[in-house]
Regions:
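PLP-dependent amino-acid enzyme catalytic core
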Residues: 1-263
Length: 263
């Protein structure tokens, strides 16, 4: 609808509430600039909707493939790694790219600092948000299927500001989402927002920022595994910003997404 507004109230949809589209961030810095003065993922702060930085983040790491490229017969294949691989300076301690989302979301301008954020997850997202909120003392309630509890691990005890509730054994991720929606109707809780949260998508989009920083241009093809597909939207939005920048190409990379059959 073309409505514009300042990001200050944890908006998850257009103020007109027409439900027609996702919020898209327009940043003051239209040209891509790496912030080498900031740690971890915040090197991409100019294209993240944040008002602060948090401790402990790691950025995606892009490198030119040798082994896989040779196996596939490719000469210009790059891999962007999100996880824990200290030898390549990848330090996401939960081993999940979801840390890109959590460190972005939790640094966003938030009108609900006196309330508790609610996140539904099947495992990876809970692990990442649990770590970030614990280390930065951000109140958090995680909703996870009981059968997925083995995916919730950490390299140390979580702070008491992080709590966990479970959908009973036999339930799945969608039941956890339903449980989180019920909780968010209560006075002292608010939803993180998932795909509707622009900070979630622009945190995911740092994977593309890392790739373009290393390669020097917009890729021709972009391969990524997806669950709900939010990561593909994030990649497309990052591509749009690079086209507007004008220094890295004017083309849309071909998004090649793979997905598990249950989705």
């Amino acid at each position: 609808c073309g409505t514009t507004f300042e990001d200050k109230e944890w908006e998850l949809e257009c103020p007109r509430k027409d439900g027609a589209a996702l919020i898209y961030a327009n940043y003051a810095k239209r040209q891509f600039e790496v912030r080498n003065d900031l740690p971890g993922i915040y090197r991409y702060a100019n294209w993240m909707p944040i008002c602060r930085t948090l401790e402990g983040s790691g950025a995606p790491v892009t490198y030119k493939s040798e082994g896989l490229a040779a196996h596939l017969g490719l000469s210009n294949l790059y891999i962007t790694f999100n996880g824990y691989w200290p030898e390549r300076n990848a330090v996401m301690k939960t081993g999940s790219f979801k840390e890109c989302e959590a460190f972005s979301v939790c640094a966003r301008n938030n009108a609900f600092t006196d309330k508790i954020m609610v996140v539904a997850s099947a495992g990876n997202t809970a692990r990442a948000f649990g770590r970030v909120c614990s280390e930065n003392h951000i109140p958090l309630l995680l909703c996870v299927p009981e059968d997925n509890l083995e995916a919730i691990w950490a390299d140390g005890p979580w702070n008491d500001c992080v709590k966990l509730v479970c959908a009973a054994s036999g339930c799945d991720y969608f039941d956890a989402i339903h449980l989180s929606n019920i909780i968010c109707e209560m006075e002292f809780f608010y939803p993180e927002g998932g795909a509707k949260n622009v900070a979630r998508r622009d945190g995911m989009g740092t994977t593309v920022l890392s790739a373009v920083e290393k390669i020097g241009r917009i890729p021709d093809y972009y391969f990524q595994a997806v669950g709900s597909g939010t990561g593909a939207i994030a990649a497309w939005e990052a591509n749009k910003r690079f086209i507007a920048d004008g220094r890295f190409g004017s083309h849309w990379m071909k998004l090649m997404v793979s997905q598990n059959a249950p989705f």
